[in-house]
Design a protein with these regions (language model features):
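Hydrophobic anchor at the beta1->P-loop junction of P-loop NTPases
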Residues: 9
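P-loop (Walker A) phosphate-binding loop of NTP-binding proteins
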Residues: 12
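Post-Walker A alpha-helix
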Residues: 20-21, 25
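Conserved substrate/cofactor phosphate-moiety recognition/catalytic segment
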Residues: 26-66, 96
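Glycine-rich phosphate-binding loop used to anchor ATP phosphates in small-molecule kinases
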Residues: 55, 59-125
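A glycine- and Lys/Arg-enriched "phosphate-lid" helix/loop adjacent to the NTP-binding pocket
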Residues: 94-167
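NTP-dependent small-molecule kinase module
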Residues: 141-225
């Protein structure tokens, strides 16, 4: 239906998403959609940081609406060009799902979010390939400490990062059930995907999977999910 590949990179905080997205886009000659900075203009985000139970739903729905608009416009703008998205819509679903496990969403709020998510994304092309940068909580905490971003160090404790990783597994399974090909890159076992050798391997996998029939399932396409 489309003449371009849509590749989305997902993963926990500190798993290397942004670095891999930039290098992979360059490697594939693709348009890069970097991680958005909607948190800077989301009117509900600072409120949610102060009272997550009260404001998380409004904040997450605002993020979802803007990310859907962004990807729709991006796909309208490209002509026969591959697109690599850092985080994007699947990460909106991941964050919202983590609110449920963390107790910031009620079951009713999660069902409402899900129904709105399904409606807003109904006519948005699904990615051909999603790359899931899988890493343990201990590993990403170490990366967060190394890069020293004050907001992350303050707000991203072990419990929060664990809820994100569990929700990433949920999103990966959901995407696969919808026919999306998922490459799982084990950051600790395989190393950062941004090294020259690993980037070459990852680009090769994506190119192969983008032309693989829906019924095919290469052994590395969904490792352990």
């Amino acid at each position: 239906m489309f003449d371009y590949k849509l590749v989305v990179i997902i993963g926990n905080v500190g798993s290397g998403k942004s670095t891999v997205s930039k290098m992979l886009a360059k490697k594939l000659g693709a348009k890069l959609v970097p991680a958005d900075k909607f948190f800077e203009i989301n009117p509900f985000f600072p409120l949610a940081l102060e009272d997550r139970k009260r404001w998380s739903l409004a904040s997450d729905l605002w993020f979802l609406k803007e990310r859907v608009k962004l990807i729709k416009q991006t796909l309208l703008d490209v002509e026969n060009q591959d697109v690599v998205v850092d985080s994007g819509i699947p990460m909106s679903l991941m964050y919202a799902n983590s609110r449920l496990s963390s107790g910031f969403f009620t079951e009713e709020e999660w069902k409402l979010y899900e129904s709105i998510y399904n409606e807003l994304t109904r006519n948005v092309p699904k990615p051909e390939v999603v790359v899931y940068m899988r890493a343990t909580v201990d590993f990403v905490r170490e990366q967060i400490e190394k890069r020293g971003r004050e907001f992350e160090v303050k707000h991203h404790d072990g419990k929060y990062l664990t809820s994100l990783e569990e929700s990433l597994e949920y999103v990966a399974r959901k995407l696969k059930s919808e026919g999306v090909k998922v490459v799982v890159w084990d950051v600790e076992r395989q190393g950062f995907a941004s090294t020259a050798e690993n980037l070459e391997m990852l680009a090769g996998r994506i190119n192969l999977m983008s032309v693989t029939r829906d019924g095919d399932n290469p052994c590395w396409s969904l490792m352990g999910v």
